[in-house]
A protein has these predicted regions:
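Short, flexible loop/turn motifs enriched in small residues
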Residues: 23-27
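Short beta-strand scaffold segments in enzyme catalytic cores
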Residues: 28-34
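Helix-adjacent hinge/juxtasegments
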Residues: 62-95, 99
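A short, polar/charged loop-to-alpha-helix boundary motif
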Residues: 49-59, 63
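Short beta->alpha transition motifs characteristic of CBS
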Residues: 40-47
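Conserved hydrophobic/aromatic pocket- or pore-lining residues that grip, position, or stack substrates
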Residues: 13, 29, 60
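Zinc-dependent deaminase
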Residues: 1-20, 84, 93-159
Length: 159
């Protein structure tokens, strides 16, 4: 069960996804929160610039390895609008980050894209737990799925 604090951070991640969409990018956003509850870093998708690795979860992993101790990384939580892709899951694991809370799952995104006739991503959409065994993961969160789906629909011209 997610706390109201968890939900506040998760809503912020979805707000960042909307900011990405408004900037012409794919709608994904993420927030890194310390074990004490302090927001350490947040970002949104930036792949529209031409680098397909500019995912917010990957940015969090890179940022955290140079600014946060291993113990603090393990105690932190990453809140994200969508479940990590395999690239971001691997970066999360290698960085030693802790818990992940996501609003919508990769399986949901794949289903929506299939429904809309959008070609699949070039990388298999594996669940985070298959990439980072033993990681604490919570999601999807039903109360935010409709909003995330609407953002994805707008991006893919289906709204």
């Amino acid at each position: 069960m997610l706390s109201e604090t968890d939900m506040r951070h998760l809503r912020r991640a979805v707000d960042l996804a909307e900011e990405a969409l408004e900037a012409g990018d794919e709608p994904f956003g993420s927030v890194l929160v310390s074990g004490e509850g302090t927001v350490l870093f947040e970002d949104r998708n930036r792949v529209a610039g031409g680098d397909p690795t500019q995912h917010p979860e990957f940015a969090i992993a890179r940022w955290s390895t140079t600014r946060v101790s291993p113990g603090e990384r393990a105690a932190a939580t990453v809140y994200t609008s969508g479940e990590h892709c395999p690239m971001c899951s691997a970066a999360h694991g290698w960085a030693g980050l802790g818990r992940i809370v996501y609003a919508s799952s990769s399986a949901q995104l794949v289903s929506w894209l299939e429904e809309w006739g959008v070609p699949p991503a070039p990388v298999r959409p594996l669940p985070v737990g298959e990439i980072v065994p033993g990681i604490a993961v919570e999601g999807p969160v039903d109360s935010l799925v409709t909003r995330v789906r609407a953002l994805q629909a707008r991006f893919h011209g289906r709204s």
